[in-house]
Amino acid sequence: IANPDMAQQQNEQVAQQSVSHPALASKRGMQALSDSGRGIPLLYSEIANKVNNAKDKPRKLKVLQDNDSVALRQVLRGAFDPKIEWAIPKGDVPYAVNEAPVGTDHTILSQEAKKLYMFVKGGDNTIKQSQRELIFIQMLEGLSAEEAEFLITVVNQKVNNKYKGFTANLVKEAFDWDDNFMKKEKKPSFPV
């Protein structure tokens, strides 16, 4: 559909651009978000680095709370909940690192998080293990190098080894979770 505010040549260029996966963040899309005044959400690897670099616990908590989302909670639960067993072998993963600069064409973990159930034991038993591992490798190859590395630390449940002070207790406190990584139930302040 032609935009009446654009010159004819610009409309033709837009029409010629290929339609890509909705989870891809193109340079043009990132610029449009920036120009619209909407903040561009941080990559999860950037959030982890901010937690790592925060000087004290209150600042670490603030980083997590400021970037709170359902997808971030899902990823961090997978990183720290000992009841979650990943169906992906632990350790290094043989994948081709996406060398595209951050902010150019690659998928982002916040949008890929909804697929993580496929890589958890009991999440999707219809997928053969070889296919599961291939899908995981493809996911890693679509992410920026930093986010892929972060996802590998999540699956290996070694986030605290790489990011100082990024612990299960910090995450539970930030999101008001109990020891089962669930939202704490509010007790009524009056007798029932």
Residue ranges of predicted features:
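N-terminal nucleic-acid-engaging modules of covalent nucleotidyltransferase systems
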Residues: 1-192
